[in-house]
Structure formats: C-alpha cells, structure tokens
UniProtKB/Swiss-Prot annotation:
Cofactor requirement: Zn(2+)
Taxonomic classification: Bacteria, Bacillati, Actinomycetota, Actinomycetes, Mycobacteriales
Function noted in UniProt: Catalyzes the attachment of alanine to tRNA(Ala) in a two-step reaction: alanine is first activated by ATP to form Ala-AMP and then transferred to the acceptor end of tRNA(Ala). Also edits incorrectly charged Ser-tRNA(Ala) and Gly-tRNA(Ala) via its editing domain.
Coiled-coil spans in chain: none
Protein name: Alanine--tRNA ligase
One GO location term (cellular component): cytosol
Alphabetized Gene3D superfamilies for the sequence: 2.40.30.130, 3.10.310.40, 3.30.54.20, 6.10.250.550, Bira Bifunctional Protein, Domain 2 (3.30.930.10), Threonyl-trna Synthetase, Chain A, domain 2 (3.30.980.10)
Binding site for Zn(2+): H581, H585, C684, H688
InterPro entries: aa-tRNA-synth_II/BPL/LPL (IPR045864), Ala-tRNA-lgiase_IIc (IPR002318), Ala-tRNA-ligase_IIc_anticod-bd (IPR018162), Ala-tRNA-synth_IIc_core (IPR018165), Ala-tRNA-synth_IIc_N (IPR018164), Ala-tRNA_ligase (IPR050058), Ala_tRNA_ligase_euk/bac (IPR023033), DHHA1_dom (IPR003156)
Gene: alaS
Keywords noted in UniProt: Aminoacyl-tRNA synthetase, ATP-binding, Cytoplasm, Ligase, Metal-binding, Nucleotide-binding, Protein biosynthesis, RNA-binding, tRNA-binding, Zinc
Entry comment, domain topic: Consists of three domains; the N-terminal catalytic domain, the editing domain and the C-terminal C-Ala domain. The editing domain removes incorrectly charged amino acids, while the C-Ala domain, along with tRNA(Ala), serves as a bridge to cooperatively bring together the editing and aminoacylation centers thus stimulating deacylation of misacylated tRNAs.
Species per Swiss-Prot/TrEMBL record: Mycobacterium sp. (strain JLS)
MF term (GO), any: alanine-tRNA ligase activity
EC number(s) reported in the record: 6.1.1.7
Length: 897
C-alpha cells in the first residue's frame, strides 16, 4: 500500500466518524520552548488546556513533525529519522478511552477491501500505564485482545507529555509483532526490534509542570475536561504494509537513495556499512531540509536556521564521501518534491524558492570546504611535525566555528591522515562557547521570569489590553513582583536599581513587546490615597500571551496590591513606535512589489524612528532595487493611504490575500491591518498610524546579509529620517567646501583623489621593494657562517608584508648557491605586527634543518606562531621589541645543529 493511500485511509476513517479534518500546522510555531513541532497535538494545546474553545469536538490531522536530538544516529541505525508524519485523532471533551481504542482497532484490523489496513489481530499487542486497569479491561472488551498480549509499563514508556509544561496523561501503545526472524518473543517489554510501536493513544487528562526527563515532573492537576490525543506513525505503518524492513526502503525515501545511487560510484546495499549510512543520511536530511525551507526556515548560525544548515551540510559532506564531486542538492530537492508533493503541495508550488535556498547553501559550504580543507592540512602537518598523533581540540573547534565543519567531518579527515582528534578538548571549547552565548543572551534579556510565579494570575486574571483605543487607562494592581517573587507592597525607599520590579495590571494601554515591535514606555501613577506613587515603565512583556508584566522603576511613594492606578503611555513614544511598525509593513509591501512574492519576511524590529526588516533572499540587492524599494515606499507614504484594522476568521483573512507569516501561530479570529486597500494586507497585532502620511519620509540606510539566504534592510522613518538626511546634507556641503567644487561634483572629485592615492601607494610599495632588494644583494655578500651553514638573518625595513618577505627570500636563496644555507627575514609590519619568513635549501635540509621547525624560534620570541614546509615557512607575531631576540634564537638553534 503506497503512503498516499495510507494517509487517505486514515483521514477518511475519522472523517466518516464525525471528525473534522484539520491541515498540518507549520513545523515552526511561535513558542520559545519548542524548536520544532514534534507531535500531532501541538496545534491543539490551547484546546486541551481550556485556553480556547475548539470549533469542533473531534478532529483528525496528519502533522509534519521534526525531532533532531538524535541527528547523529540517523543513518547509523534505520530507526532514527529527523522528519516524520504523525497521523492523529483528537477528542476535546467528547469520547475518551473506549472510543479511542475502538477507532484505532477498527482501522488497523479491518480488511483492505473494507477501507482498513488489514493487520492480523493475532499479531497486535498493547501496552498500558501501570495502574490503568480501565484500559486493560477495554482492550479485552472492545478489541478482544487477550490479557497475555497486554503489558503494563511505567511513566517513561506509557505516560506522555511534550517534554515541557503542558497537557499530559497516561497512554496505551499498539505494537505489531514482526515475527521470530526479528528477535525473541515476549512482547514489547522484551524486544522492541521485533515488536514495533505503530500507534500511541494518549488519554490526555492532566497538566504537568517543570521537570526533566520522561518522568521527573510534577502533575499540577486535572485538565478542564478529558481529551484524547493519538499518534500513528505514517512511516512505520508504511514499512509494515509495504513489506520492507525500514523507512529507507519505502516509497518515501527509496527514490532519494536511488537518485543518489545513479550518480555515486559505489551503490547502496553493496556491503559497505559506512556508504549505506551516508546514503541514509542524504535521504533523511534532504527530506527534512525541504520541509523546513518550505515552512520558512533559512540556513543560519543558531536555532532553527542552524539545524537546517547542519542538515544540508551533512547531505553535502555525505555525497562527497560517496564520490559525488558535482553539485547534488538541487536534484535532491526535486526528488523530494516528486516523492512528497502529493501529500504536501507546497513543496511543488514553492519549489523554486526551496531549491534556490538549498543550492545557495551548497555553494557556500563548498567554498568553506575548500578553505577549511586548507586549514585542516596545515593543522595536520603542524601536528605531525610536532611528533603528535592527535589534532588539538582548538584546531577542531576553529574548523567548526570558523568554517562550519561538523566534528564528524574533522574526525573522518583526521582518520584519513592517521590522526586522532582531541574530542574532549573540542567539546570543552564548544561548552564554553555555549555558556558565553547563554550569558550574553541573559545579559541582553533579563526579563525572563519563571512562569510558576505568575501561574495564578495567568490562569485567573488575564490582562485586558486597551491600547488600541486609548493611551491612558484606569487599572487595578493584580500583583507586584520583586526579582520574580510576589510581594504585597513595593516602595521607592525599598526598591533599588538592582531590583527587578514588575507590576501586573488588570487593564493596560501599554503595548507588550511582540511581533517585532518593542514595548511602550510611560508611567504608572497612584490615585486617591496612593497618589504620591509614581513609576516609570521601561519595558512590558507578555506571560503566556495573556498577562502584561510591566517592568518599572519606582520614583516616589509606594504601590500596594489591589490599589487603583493610572497607566499612561508616553504619546511621543507610541507615535514613534507606530511610525516604525507601519513603516515596516510599507517596506515589506514594497519589497514584494520589487522582488516578487519569494521575498518572505524572516524577522523584524521596529522602534520609534527606526525599522529593521529581515527577509529570505539570495544575493545582495542592486542599487537600482534599493532605490525602487525606497521610492515605492515613499510614494505610498505620500499617497496618504488610510490605515485601518479589523478582525475576521483566519481562513477568510488568508482568502483575502492577507500575509500570514511563516512560523506564526494564529488563533481562529485574527486581526488584519490594511494599508491603502491592496497595497498592504497583513495579519498583525501591533499598533499603527491612522494614515500612511503620518509615517513621514522613509530613508533606507543600507542592506546587508545576516545569514545565508537572509538579507536585512534598515531604515529611518519620520523625524529621524529627516535628521539623517539633514546630517548627510551637511556632510556633503562640508565636503564640497573642502574640495572647492559644487556638491554634484563631489563624487567624481573623491573618486579621482582615491585613484591618485592608490597610484601613490603602489609607487611607494614598488620603491620599498626595490630598496629591499638592493639590501638583499648586500645581505648575500655579508652572509655569516654558523657552523656548516651560510646564514642570512636580517631585520628588514618597516611596512613590509609577508608576501614581500617571501619575494626577497627567493631572491637571496637563489644567490647563495648549493652550499647549506638558511635565509630568515623579519620585519615590522602594520599595526605592530611582525611578519617573518624562513627558507632552508636542500643542502641545509640534509643537515637536519627544517624551515617549519626554525620558524618556531621566531614565533616564540615575538609572541606569534608559524608553520609551513621543510623548505619554506612563515608566520606572524606581535611586538617589534622581540625581533633581535628572535634572530639570536635562530642563530643559536642553527649552531646547535
């Protein structure tokens, strides 16, 4: 049975049983705790928690899922995959255990000609949670499953959660016995190679708290109602119904393996385990990469972007290790499209963008492979020259950090060079880097607060946001927090600058930071008996998307929980913020007009007077494109388009053409911001101007790369734009005055001066080298005898580069004849650098002298290092004070030889 038929039968089965078919959500959601969607129930979490009322009591879906913790195991075993499809049926307060078991058993065991999968009931097993006697009884009554094929298991196996705070509950898993050829009997408890799990029925009835692992967490209490969440692995069912041993042999991944085999000199399944691993890595990672790019992820250096980059680079590396030297990723994306397109049409409609981003990453990584390979060769040579047999952790870290080399690639290249790698040192450096990154992140954002301190308020008292309609609101203090701890009162006398003071209000006009718009600033003041209390608001964050937490500095008086206060947004701040946010929408619309619909938003930041917009695009914008984008934006500003917002159903908004951005999780009812009718239409929860003319002029400051396939546009708006233009006008006037030309002639005059300066520098370099060569002739005549070796060791004039020194060394070495000779030149370079070059002719090498050993004497004396080969080596240090000591150390080393 083909995979598309397996999917169809699943959905049809549950739709006929009164379930609403719900499309798969994106694999990326607006949840900082979840890197990727990893379960079918993720998009339904608000329904399970009772935060939103579901529009249906029964639902079914096939969710795209990504799990990457075991990425290094992919290919080594055939059980691990980074992408999988989870088919599920869900009940929100409707049927519970009996219905879930009945629906699953019917679909699995019904004959193929009756729309089932046709599994033999005698080969099916079930596991249940330790004390779930009810589930055991239902399996016997509903399915007729004998007690000997039902096993009890603990929390690690049969109690399900997402691994983070949220809904959870006991589960019952269904297994298929593949037969004695796959191992010993005894059920899932004895052998999970023979007994394969295909369906997990979760009886979602509790909410869990913080904790680690599969069982170390607190059960906070029951959910508002009992729910059902099930997950059937499409890939595993496909293996069984297609009669193959693993997912790589199914119609999902085998086409990718065959496409690679058609180009590789060594085939799949020909006896080489390492080659088969590479084939499987390519097949798995290509599919996952296509899905990620299709859902809006671009290669980057952290988070989701880093995962995508790592996947693609493992594909490229594996292909090269299979002997495929040509570009391969573009063809792989096409093969994935053909295999997965029937189930995921976006892989077809958005194929050009998916392929372009993947190919651009391949091109970039091929360059880093070339550069990194040279660094690896140097490091390997230096390691061997030092008599060591292990590449240092520092070298491995540099290859990873600078060139993007996976440690696996370094290990393989080292093995080919008969070297080991200091993996412990590498991991230590990686840990230090991660720790620095965490510390930096904490320093940048100290507003992170443990949710448990706010749980009572989150659940019972969500904040009402009034800021769309007013800037001043009467409110009541719901809670006061000092450094994350709830207190009844806080005052100016007790709150120091070192304390993090936060006020939670029942109503607030302050916009809480989200959607790229930074938070409002303003004041909170007391009323009545507390009218002396005043606090400056510097930041506002959302907790669980419903509670506004105001970061404040108490300037006078004291605030008491329950007091009535006046919350007032600074109107100038809000106006500037709305200019920036509306300007972001305008620039986004202009970008899409100029570049086309593939210029998809990847991030944004807007604050008073400034906006920053990241978008997916390959290659830098041309000057003409930049100019066009700026012109289209300002023409729309000048047109004074009306800006208005309205709420509507999500699907209706999408049908109107509203931009729904990748990775955002939207409710059923959404807010749409419209600027000038068709000019800009986006789903947005931010604040905006009333008409486009209020934005003022928009000046694009520049455009740059912020990662592979992601560009950034920055701009000033409003008064800040005017000030920027005024500064540029004053700068141009000053240049024109200094150059004594009209403003319009300044560029030509500056270009002429630059050319003259370049010519003068070139002539200066020529004269410096000529003088150095003349000095070199004298150096040959004055060569000193050190033992059996003629030595030319000189300090050269300042300003010489390593390239200049290599040229001179070549001249001198050629004039010294065939006797043993060593040439060593060192100079004072720019910025206190000290370049040096050492050459050893063949006769001196016969005496045991090596340039790459002698160069170490220079490096030690001038706080530097160097490397190279036996005949020629070079390096660089810091500090000219050590030059004489370096020359003396060299003489002493030669004399000892």
């Amino acid at each position: 049975m083909q995979t598309h038929e397996i999917r169809k039968r699943f959905l049809d089965h549950f739709v006929k049983a009164g379930h609403t078919e719900v499309p798969s959500a994106s694999v990326i959601l607006d949840d900082p705790n979840l890197l990727f969607v990893n379960a079918g129930m993720v998009q339904f979490v608000p329904f399970f928690l009772g935060q939103r009322t579901p529009p249906y009591q029964r639902a079914t879906s096939i969710q795209k899922c990504i799990r990457t913790p075991d990425i290094d195991e992919v290919g080594i075993t055939t059980r691990h995959n980074t992408f999988f499809q989870m088919a599920g049926n869900f009940s929100f307060g409707d049927y519970f255990k009996k219905g879930a078991i009945e629906f699953a058993w019917t679909l699995l065991t019904n004959p193929v000609d009756q729309s089932g999968y046709g599994f033999d009931p005698e080969k099916l097993w079930a596991t249940v949670y330790l004390d779930d006697d009810e589930a055991i009884q239902l399996w016997q009554e509903v399915a007729g499953l004998p007690l000997e094929r039902i096993q009890r298991r603990g929390m690690a196996d049969n109690y399900w959660s997402m691994g983070i705070p949220g809904p959870c509950g006991p589960s019952s898993e269904i297994y298929v016995d593949r037969g004695p050829e796959y191992g010993i009997e005894g059920g899932p408890e004895a052998n999970e190679d023979r007994y394969i799990e295909i369906w997990n029925l979760v009886f979602m009835q509790n909410e869990r708290g913080e904790g680690t692992g599969k069982s170390d967490f607190e059960i906070l209490g029951p959910l508002p109602r009992k729910n059902i969440d099930t997950g059937m692995g499409i890939e595993r069912v496909a293996c069984l119904l297609q009669g193959v041993d693993n997912v790589y042999e199914t119609d999902l991944l085998r086409p990718v393996i065959d496409a690679v085999a058609a180009r590789a000199p060594r085939g799949y399944g020909r006896g080489s385990h390492s080659d088969d691993v590479r084939y499987r890595i390519i097949a798995d990672h290509s599919r996952t990469a296509a899905i990620l790019i299709g859902d809006g992820v671009s290669p980057g250096n952290d988070g989701r972007g880093y995962v995508l980059r790592r996947l693609l680079r493992r594909v490229i590396r594996s292909a090269k290790l299979l002997g495929i030297d040509d570009a391969v990723v573009g063809d792989l994306m096409a093969t994935v499209r053909d295999a997965m397109g029937p189930s995921y049409p976006e892989l077809v409609t958005d194929f050009d963008r998916i392929q372009r981003i993947a190919v651009a990453e391949e091109t970039a990584f091929n360059r880093t492979l070339s550069s990194g390979s040279r660094l690896f060769e140097e490091a390997a040579q230096s390691t061997k020259a030092a008599g060591a047999d292990r590449l240092s952790g520092r070298d491995a870290f540099t290859l990873h950090d600078t060139y993007g080399f996976p440690i696996e690639l370094t290990l393989e290249m080292a093995a080919e060079a008969d070297l080991a790698v200091d993996e412990e040192g590498f991991r230590s450096l990686m840990a230090e880097q991660r720790q620095r990154a965490k510390a930096d992140a904490a320093a940048r954002k100290q507003a992170h607060t443990d949710l448990t301190a706010y749980r009572e308020l989150v659940d019972a008292h969500p904040t009402q946001f009034t800021g769309f309609d007013e800037l001043t609101t009467e409110a009541r203090i719901l809670g006061i927090f000092v450094d994350g701890r709830r207190v009844p009162v806080v005052g100016h006398d007790t709150a120091t600058a070192q304390h993090r003071i936060e006020l939670v209000l029942d109503r607030s006009p302050f916009y809480a930071e989200s959607g790229g718009q930074i938070a409002d600033e303003g004041t909170i003041t007391g009323t009545g008996a507390s009218q002396t209390a005043k606090a400056a608001v510097s930041d506002v964050q959302k907790i669980a998307k419903t509670l506004w937490v105001h970061r404040v500095t108490v300037e006078s008086g004291e605030f008491v929980e329950g007091d009535t206060v006046t919350a007032a947004v600074d109107p100038r701040w809000r106006h500037g913020a709305t200019q920036g946010h509306s300007g972001t929408h305008m620039v986004h619309a202009a970008l899409r007009q100029v570049l086309g619909p593939n210029a998809v938003q990847a991030g944004s930041l807007n604050r008073p007077g400034y906006l920053r917009f990241d978008f997916n695009w390959q290659g830098a914008l041309t000057d003409d494109q930049r100019t066009q984008i700026e012109e289209v934006t300002n023409e729309a500003v000048e047109a004074d388009f009306e800006v208005h917002s309205f709420t509507t159903e999500l699907e209706k908004a999408k049908s109107m053409g509203a931009m729904a951005l990748f990775g955002e999780a939207y409710p059923d009812e959404v807010r749409v911001v419209e600027i000038g009718g068709p000019f800009s239409l986006e789903l947005c929860g931010g604040t905006h101007v009333r008409s486009s003319a209020q934005i003022g002029p928009v000046t694009i400051l520049g455009e740059s790369s912020v990662g592979s396939g992601v560009r950034r546009v920055e701009a000033y708006v409003g008064l800040d734009s005017f000030r920027h233009l005024a500064k540029e006008r004053a700068l141009m006037a000053g240049l024109a005055s200094s150059l004594k030309v009209p403003s319009e002639e300044v560029p030509a005059r500056v270009a002429g001066l630059v050319e003259r300066l370049k010519a003068a520098e070139k002539e200066l370099d020529r004269m410096r080298l000529a003088n150095a060569r003349a000095a070199a002739v004298n150096a040959v005549a004055g060569a000193e005898r050190v033992g059996k070796v003629r030595l030319v060791a000189q300090r050269m004039a300042g300003g010489m580069s390593a390239g200049d020194l290599r040229t001179l060394v070549g001249d001198i070495r050629g004039k010294l004849g065939g006797d043993p000779a060593v040439v060593a030149l060192i100079a004072e370079g720019d910025n206190d650098t000290v370049p040096f070059v050492v050459a050893v002719n063949p006769a001196a090498q016969d005496l045991g002298l090596r340039a790459n050993e002698l160069v170490k004497q220079f490096g030690a004396a001038v706080n530097g290092r160097g490397g190279g080969k036996a005949d020629l080596a070079q390096g660089s240090g810091k500090g000219a004070a050590g030059i004489d000591a370096a020359l003396a150390a060299l003489r002493a080393e030669i004399d000892r030889s």
